Protein backbone atom coordinates (compact mmCIF):
# COMPACT_ATOMS: atom_id res chain seq x y z
CA UNK A 1 0.00 0.00 0.00
CA UNK A 2 1.20 3.49 -0.84
CA UNK A 3 2.04 5.50 2.26
CA UNK A 4 2.31 9.28 2.41
CA UNK A 5 2.88 12.02 4.93
CA UNK A 6 0.73 15.05 5.66
CA UNK A 7 2.33 18.38 4.77
CA UNK A 8 2.17 20.91 7.59
CA UNK A 9 2.99 23.90 5.40
CA UNK A 10 1.75 24.39 1.85
CA UNK A 11 4.30 27.07 0.98
CA UNK A 12 6.23 27.07 -2.28
CA UNK A 13 9.59 26.78 -0.51
CA UNK A 14 8.48 23.74 1.50
CA UNK A 15 7.08 22.07 -1.63
CA UNK A 16 10.38 22.69 -3.44
CA UNK A 17 12.35 21.24 -0.51
CA UNK A 18 10.15 18.11 -0.52
CA UNK A 19 10.62 17.68 -4.28
CA UNK A 20 14.40 17.96 -3.85
CA UNK A 21 14.20 15.21 -1.20
CA UNK A 22 12.47 12.87 -3.69
CA UNK A 23 8.83 13.47 -2.74
CA UNK A 24 5.80 13.95 -4.96
CA UNK A 25 3.41 16.70 -3.83
CA UNK A 26 -0.24 15.59 -3.74
CA UNK A 27 -3.69 16.90 -2.85
CA UNK A 28 -6.53 14.58 -1.86
CA UNK A 29 -10.05 15.96 -2.08
CA UNK A 30 -13.65 14.85 -2.31
CA UNK A 31 -17.22 16.11 -2.01
CA UNK A 32 -17.95 17.23 1.54
CA UNK A 33 -14.43 16.34 2.69
CA UNK A 34 -11.58 18.49 3.93
CA UNK A 35 -8.66 18.76 1.48
CA UNK A 36 -5.58 16.81 2.53
CA UNK A 37 -2.19 18.21 1.52
CA UNK A 38 0.33 15.36 1.49
CA UNK A 39 3.50 14.04 -0.10
CA UNK A 40 4.52 10.58 -1.33
CA UNK A 41 7.97 9.20 -2.13
CA UNK A 42 8.17 9.61 -5.91
CA UNK A 43 9.67 6.17 -6.60
CA UNK A 44 7.11 4.43 -4.35
CA UNK A 45 4.27 6.28 -6.12
CA UNK A 46 5.50 5.26 -9.58
CA UNK A 47 5.92 1.61 -8.48
CA UNK A 48 2.40 1.56 -6.99
CA UNK A 49 0.90 3.01 -10.20
CA UNK A 50 2.60 0.37 -12.35
CA UNK A 51 1.37 -2.45 -10.10
CA UNK A 52 -2.25 -1.35 -9.64
CA UNK A 53 -4.91 -3.25 -11.56
CA UNK A 54 -7.87 -0.88 -11.07
CA UNK A 55 -8.39 2.87 -11.30
CA UNK A 56 -9.27 3.00 -7.59
CA UNK A 57 -6.35 2.28 -5.27
CA UNK A 58 -5.70 2.65 -1.51
CA UNK A 59 -3.31 5.16 0.06
CA UNK A 60 -2.44 5.62 3.70
CA UNK A 61 -2.03 9.20 4.89
CA UNK A 62 -1.97 10.36 8.50
CA UNK A 63 -2.93 6.92 9.83
CA UNK A 64 -6.06 6.73 7.64
CA UNK A 65 -6.55 4.47 4.64
CA UNK A 66 -8.30 6.22 1.75
CA UNK A 67 -9.57 4.90 -1.59
CA UNK A 68 -8.55 7.38 -4.31
CA UNK A 69 -8.41 7.87 -8.09
CA UNK A 70 -5.86 9.98 -9.98
CA UNK A 71 -7.70 13.05 -11.25
CA UNK A 72 -4.86 15.18 -12.67
CA UNK A 73 -1.08 15.20 -12.69
CA UNK A 74 1.63 17.66 -13.68
CA UNK A 75 5.02 16.85 -15.16
CA UNK A 76 8.13 18.97 -15.35
CA UNK A 77 8.39 20.20 -18.97
CA UNK A 78 12.16 19.70 -19.13
CA UNK A 79 12.84 16.52 -17.15
CA UNK A 80 9.40 14.92 -17.70
CA UNK A 81 9.23 13.82 -14.03
CA UNK A 82 6.05 14.01 -11.98
CA UNK A 83 5.90 17.11 -9.78
CA UNK A 84 2.27 17.16 -8.59
CA UNK A 85 -0.78 14.88 -8.51
CA UNK A 86 -4.44 15.48 -7.59
CA UNK A 87 -6.20 12.48 -6.05
CA UNK A 88 -10.00 12.30 -5.84
CA UNK A 89 -11.62 10.34 -3.03
CA UNK A 90 -13.64 7.43 -4.43
CA UNK A 91 -16.77 7.85 -2.30
CA UNK A 92 -19.38 5.12 -2.66
CA UNK A 93 -22.80 6.33 -3.80
CA UNK A 94 -21.63 9.85 -4.74
CA UNK A 95 -21.55 10.82 -8.43
CA UNK A 96 -18.21 12.24 -9.57
CA UNK A 97 -16.43 12.93 -12.84
CA UNK A 98 -13.61 10.54 -13.68
CA UNK A 99 -11.28 10.04 -16.64
CA UNK A 100 -11.14 6.42 -17.80
CA UNK A 101 -8.19 5.31 -19.98
CA UNK A 102 -8.56 3.83 -23.46
CA UNK A 103 -6.67 0.57 -24.14
CA UNK A 104 -6.17 -0.40 -27.78
CA UNK A 105 -6.04 -4.14 -28.60
CA UNK A 106 -5.07 -5.87 -31.83
CA UNK A 107 -3.39 -4.76 -35.06
CA UNK A 108 -5.45 -2.75 -37.51
CA UNK A 109 -5.57 -4.21 -41.03
CA UNK A 110 -5.16 -0.67 -42.37
CA UNK A 111 -1.57 -0.69 -41.12
CA UNK A 112 -0.71 -3.15 -43.92
CA UNK A 113 -2.25 -0.72 -46.44
CA UNK A 114 0.18 2.10 -45.54
CA UNK A 115 -2.03 3.50 -42.79
CA UNK A 116 -1.10 4.84 -39.36
CA UNK A 117 -3.03 4.13 -36.16
CA UNK A 118 -4.02 7.45 -34.56
CA UNK A 119 -5.31 7.54 -30.96
CA UNK A 120 -7.05 10.90 -30.60
CA UNK A 121 -8.71 10.38 -27.20
CA UNK A 122 -6.57 8.68 -24.55
CA UNK A 123 -8.97 9.21 -21.64
CA UNK A 124 -12.79 9.23 -21.70
CA UNK A 125 -14.63 11.56 -19.28
CA UNK A 126 -17.42 9.78 -17.40
CA UNK A 127 -19.76 10.60 -14.54
CA UNK A 128 -20.68 7.79 -12.17
CA UNK A 129 -20.45 6.51 -8.62
CA UNK A 130 -17.16 4.92 -7.54
CA UNK A 131 -18.60 1.40 -7.40
CA UNK A 132 -19.67 1.61 -11.09
CA UNK A 133 -16.37 3.04 -12.37
CA UNK A 134 -14.97 0.97 -15.28
CA UNK A 135 -11.23 0.25 -15.15
CA UNK A 136 -10.71 0.99 -18.85
CA UNK A 137 -12.36 1.07 -22.25
CA UNK A 138 -10.80 -1.77 -24.26
CA UNK A 139 -11.09 -1.24 -28.00
CA UNK A 140 -10.33 -3.91 -30.61
CA UNK A 141 -8.96 -2.22 -33.74
CA UNK A 142 -8.37 -5.40 -35.80
CA UNK A 143 -11.11 -4.52 -38.33
CA UNK A 144 -10.06 -0.89 -38.92
CA UNK A 145 -8.90 -0.07 -42.44
CA UNK A 146 -7.51 3.22 -43.79
CA UNK A 147 -10.11 5.94 -43.22
CA UNK A 148 -12.04 4.01 -40.54
CA UNK A 149 -12.44 5.23 -36.99
CA UNK A 150 -14.16 4.31 -33.74
CA UNK A 151 -16.29 7.04 -32.17
CA UNK A 152 -17.46 7.56 -28.59
CA UNK A 153 -20.91 6.23 -29.54
CA UNK A 154 -19.29 2.95 -30.71
CA UNK A 155 -17.76 2.22 -27.28
CA UNK A 156 -19.28 -0.43 -25.01
CA UNK A 157 -21.87 0.96 -22.59
CA UNK A 158 -21.60 0.30 -18.86
CA UNK A 159 -24.57 0.36 -16.47
CA UNK A 160 -24.95 3.59 -14.45
CA UNK A 161 -22.02 5.24 -16.28
CA UNK A 162 -22.71 8.47 -18.18
CA UNK A 163 -20.10 9.35 -20.85
CA UNK A 164 -19.53 13.12 -20.93
CA UNK A 165 -17.69 13.34 -24.28
CA UNK A 166 -19.73 14.14 -27.39
CA UNK A 167 -20.87 10.95 -29.21
CA UNK A 168 -19.33 12.12 -32.52
CA UNK A 169 -15.78 12.44 -31.12
CA UNK A 170 -13.27 9.98 -32.60
CA UNK A 171 -11.39 7.80 -30.12
CA UNK A 172 -9.10 5.89 -32.47
CA UNK A 173 -8.72 5.69 -36.23
CA UNK A 174 -6.46 4.67 -39.08
CA UNK A 175 -5.29 7.54 -41.26
CA UNK A 176 -3.42 7.42 -44.55
CA UNK A 177 0.33 7.93 -44.23
CA UNK A 178 1.74 10.78 -46.28
UniProtKB/Swiss-Prot annotation:
Any GO MF annotation of the entry: 5S rRNA binding
The residues forming a coiled coil are none
Segments traversing the membrane = none
| Keywords assigned by UniProt, alphabetized | Ribonucleoprotein, Ribosomal protein, RNA-binding, rRNA-binding
Q: What are the BP-aspect GO terms? A: translation
Signal peptide positions are none
Instruction: State any GO CC term.
Output: cytosolic large ribosomal subunit
SUPFAM superfamilies on file: Ribosomal protein L25-like
Instruction: Describe its function.
Output: This is one of the proteins that binds to the 5S RNA in the ribosome where it forms part of the central protuberance.
Q: How does it assemble?
A: Part of the 50S ribosomal subunit; part of the 5S rRNA/L5/L18/L25 subcomplex. Contacts the 5S rRNA. Binds to the 5S rRNA independently of L5 and L18.
Q: Tell me its family.
A: Belongs to the bacterial ribosomal protein bL25 family. CTC subfamily.
The protein's name: Large ribosomal subunit protein bL25
Native species: Helicobacter hepaticus (strain ATCC 51449 / 3B1)
Species lineage = Bacteria, Pseudomonadati, Campylobacterota, Epsilonproteobacteria, Campylobacterales
Q: Gene name on record?
A: rplY
Amino acid sequence: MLEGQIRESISKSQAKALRNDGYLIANIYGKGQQNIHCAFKLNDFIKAMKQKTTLIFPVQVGGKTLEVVIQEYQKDPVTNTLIHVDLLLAQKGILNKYKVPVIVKGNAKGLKNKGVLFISTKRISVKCAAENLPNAYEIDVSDLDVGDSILIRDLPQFDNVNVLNRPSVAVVGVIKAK
